[in-house]
Amino acid sequence: MILTIGMIFTLASCGGDKTENGGQQAGGAKKIDYANMTEDDLIKEFIKDEKNITLDEFIDLVSTYSYATINNKLELDENITDKAIKKLKDNKATLPAAKEIVEPLLKSDSLQVRGYAFSNIATFFGASDSHKAAAKAILKNEKDPYVIKCAVRALGNEGGKDAEIGKFLLSAAKNENAVVRRQAAVALGSTWNKTLDGAVDAEIELMKDSDNEVRKAAYEYAGLLGDDRVVAPISEMLKNEADADLHSSGVRGLVWLWYDYPSHENTSEAAYRATIDYFKTTPGSDKVPAWAAVTSFTNKSEKNYAAWKEKATYFNTDELYEVMLGLVKNENLGRMTRGYACKPVAAHCTKEQFNAFGTVVNALTDKNAKFIQDEYQKQAAKLDE
């Protein structure tokens, strides 16, 4: 589940391309010498009493986001509005609640301010009906990639419950801006969107994207949808060493399908077999298998693991032991891949198997032997705790 928690917070994660809107004031706010001000100046300019901040005062303060610059990652560059709001929070100032500020800020002429409004829509319990209605009205005509990214992030868990928002998320997956498409890949992969018709197909299409960051997100988050249709395209990518930088994301996508930490609910044998097949890649290299893939299923929930293991009849610790042993013996592989092969054995295999694994590790003499042996000792120490 992908959640955005909180009521009043900054826009660090919701920033387009450099925009000419930086410097334009919003909502009728007075002109200020923003570039030469500090956060203290900003608070003094707009707030009379920190313990009794009015809605109008706070909206005027937030409207100064319009002076902030949006960078190519669709994030706001460092700005004093962020700092001023943080300082007010640190000072225990009484700030208006999101339910009061969202709708008026969504109507701002400033895209930075509209982005802030979207960032305040989502809570742990999801967006309210009134906020969703206001958001949908704005999004009918919204074209700016910065605002769309913020909206996708805020509404990412709503696609399976609201057809109109679902349609918006699917359209964002086709946006011309790669940053928006990446955010759509993350959002569509929310477990809340399992019932969104078209989500799986959109993720599979994003796996073919021209931008590797988009592909990486699609490979990783698609598995959260619990649909075996994503196994084949992930498996094909894992066979291509040219995509080695994407391999750990692909394996994480598979792991969601068969291991699903911490809930341990999913039991896809096809995804498990694809994972094991990847670890059997020969002859291997310093990049393949990816070291982060080896550690992608080493955490486990003491509450749910045993029940999962009973259902996951495909999960064979003897097989896992042999596969990890193959990694640690293969001198073609990177030292981290070999060293971290100790971790799945420690997490899932028997004490006897772990000890036998140590015998092999301690007999290594190649240039990476000490690193691997040190990693084994770290796992041994944890098991003895």
Stretches found by the model and what they are:
Residues 21-30:
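N-terminal, intrinsically disordered, polar/charged segments of Gram-positive cell-envelope systems
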Residues 15-17:
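Bacterial signal peptide processing site
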